[in-house]
Design a protein with these regions (language model features):
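A glycine- and small-aliphatic-rich helix-loop capping segment at beta-alpha/alpha-beta transitions
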Residues: 8-19, 77-81, 116-128, 210-212
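Beta-strand segments within the central parallel beta-sheet cores of soluble alpha/beta enzyme folds
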Residues: 1, 55-63, 98-105, 131-137, ...
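Condensing-enzyme catalytic core mediating Claisen C-C bond formation in acyl metabolism
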Residues: 20-93, 101-102, 169
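Glycine/charged-rich beta-loop-alpha catalytic/anionic-binding loops adjacent to active sites
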Residues: 19-27, 67, 128-138, 189
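Short helix-capping segments at alpha-helix termini
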Residues: 53, 93-96, 123-129
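Conserved beta-strand-centric core segments of catalytic alpha/beta enzyme folds
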Residues: 1-48, 146-212
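Active-site/binding-pocket entry motifs
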Residues: 16, 65-66, 109, 175
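Short glycine/threonine-rich loop-to-helix capping motif typified by GTGT followed
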Residues: 70-82, 108-125, 142-149
């Protein structure tokens, strides 16, 4: 949760946006804008949910976490930790990179994180090979709630057959080779979506959600 101490700490780290605008992966990004929020995902065994006639919005196909421990705040160069985490999640889901049709990125709007994640996504899936979105342009980083919020966004994207745009971003930094969704929602044929959350201290998490 946001509080004065947290804001002061992030401010001293120069992690907060001086413009007050969260614009993930944008060439003009200058830091994040603290957010608050919550999301609840109800998880149930497939057979049990089917038996009781539940309305299924998505299926968890796989997940993984690791700890690069490169630096207490900075990501590992080239997104090495993120690369390993996404590949572990793919292996857990028994999927190949070509099976992923959307990346719900961690995308905090900080110069270092976004550059590292873009490099990692390009390495794992290929340059510009898969649509990328960060919902933090709307929510900002909600700290402990970020993963649940973004997983919920991924489920809703599948349910509505629309990839939301990355708010406030007009296009990716020219140094990045990613297909960033901007401007308007993009229709798509829902399929496996990887949702990333990469935190301080090099701890990384990736989950893969698919249509039910």
């Amino acid at each position: 949760a946001s509080n004065v101490t947290a804001l002061a700490g992030f401010g001293n780290m120069t992690a907060l946006s001086s413009s007050g605008i969260s614009r993930p992966f944008d060439a003009e990004r200058d830091g994040f804008v603290m957010g608050e929020g919550a999301a609840v995902l109800i998880l149930e065994e497939w057979e049990h949910a089917r038996a009781r006639g539940a309305r299924l919005l998505g299926e968890i196909l796989g997940s993984a976490s690791n700890a690069a421990a490169h630096h207490v705040t900075a990501p590992s160069p080239g997104g090495v930790g993120a690369i390993g985490c996404m590949r572990l999640a793919l292996a857990h889901a028994c999927l190949s990179p070509a099976d992923i049709v959307q990346v719900n990125a961690h995308g905090t709007s900080t110069p270092l994180n976004d550059a590292a994640e873009a490099a990692a996504v390009s390495e794992v899936f290929g340059p510009g090979a898969v649509p990328v979105v960060s919902t933090k342009g709307v929510t900002g980083p909600a700290l402990g709630a970020a993963g649940a919020l973004e997983a919920a966004a991924g489920v809703l994207s599948i349910a509505n057959a629309l990839i939301p745009p990355t708010a406030n971003s007009t296009g990716p930094d020219p140094e990045m080779s990613i297909d960033l969704v901007t401007g308007a929602a993009r229709p798509w044929v829902p399929g496996p979506t990887i949702s990333n959350n990469f935190g301080f201290g090099g701890h990384n998490g990736s989950g893969i959600i698919g249509p039910a």
